[in-house]
Amino acid sequence: MSSSMKAPLRNPPRLLAGEGRVHLSASNAHPCFSTSLAAYPLKLLSPTPLPSQPANFAVLYTLAYGGGLVAGDLVSLSVLIDPGCGLVMLTQGTTKVYKRRPGLRPLSHLHTSQPSSDPNLTRQRMHIRLCSSSFLLLLPDSVSPFRSSIYSQTQRFVLPADRTASVLILDWVNSGRGQRPQEGDEEIWSMDSYGSTNEIWVGDERIMRERMVLDNSHFGLNAGGSLSPIANQLSPYNVYATVLIIGPHLTTLFSYLAYLSDHSRQFQLKEPPGLAWSFSEIDDKLQAGVVRIAACEVEDARKWLREVMTAGGVAALVGEGMWPRCI
């Protein structure tokens, strides 16, 4: 064979429907995505770094074609973050979950690695592995499950055993379409079921596991019917959020939340407040903790999160230009 002949280019690996693979690698300037692959209905976007953006991190948007997921969809994303790199993961608007949507992706979920026994189930899975001194900020918009949808989400974050990596995970859900006077309907917490599980591992040790389950499936809800049992139980709140934090990059935020928690008193009131929150310290040495929030409106929760994260130094991690786009 002539030495001048070039080796044939490798074709990118074939992905299953809804599968994504990301590898964030270090470079001389900003970290770069040495791998960024996605198959319909998943879409990945990486914007050009802003001038004010610190040099040690990159931004990735995860999107669904059509702005939502339907029954039978499976989205499975795996991410690797190299040493010293930071990744900010965002969305562009709420992730809407439909039971069905005529004309949308009739072939999107015919071939998956693990077919679901329930064709009405919508699934999202994420597995993110961080290397030494790396960090992740996962700050999506809230999930919006619509009437009769069945949604299951599992997210696992694996940090190195040397305890030098950090993650901040925002996981939140809203009540759906809400009041729809034109339809003579209130579509509030009217999904069949919603489940979300988050796990954080440090080496081989699981440090945190948070699970939220909302289940209306046994109550036989009908379109145009009365409020669901879940809606009555969760009233007056239309958004619930969980924030998991761990690692040395988030020491200021951990300390600030602990201070706020120690100096805040939420007394028993005749009427529930517009926003209620709590902070639980999981491991002081690892700077690990969990924030739980209930709010009447998504914007109430967003405002509180933005104020606390800004005061806790998260804005400084991403720069003044990028921060307003994060939360």
UniProtKB/Swiss-Prot annotation:
Disulfide bonds: none annotated. The chain crosses the membrane at residues 239-259. The lineage of its organism: Eukaryota, Fungi, Dikarya, Basidiomycota, Agaricomycotina. This is Urease accessory protein 4. InterPro entries: UreD. It comes from Cryptococcus neoformans var. grubii serotype A (strain H99 / ATCC 208821 / CBS 10515 / FGSC 9487). It is a single-pass membrane protein. Belongs to the UreD family. It comes from the Eukaryota. URE4, URE6 and URE7 may form a complex that acts as a GTP-hydrolysis-dependent molecular chaperone, activating the urease apoprotein URE1. Disruption phenotype: Fails to grow on agar media with urea as the sole nitrogen source. Leads to the inactivation of the URE1 urease and reduces the efficacy of brain invasion in mice. One of its GO terms (molecular function) is nickel cation binding. Glycans are attached at N120. The gene is URE4.
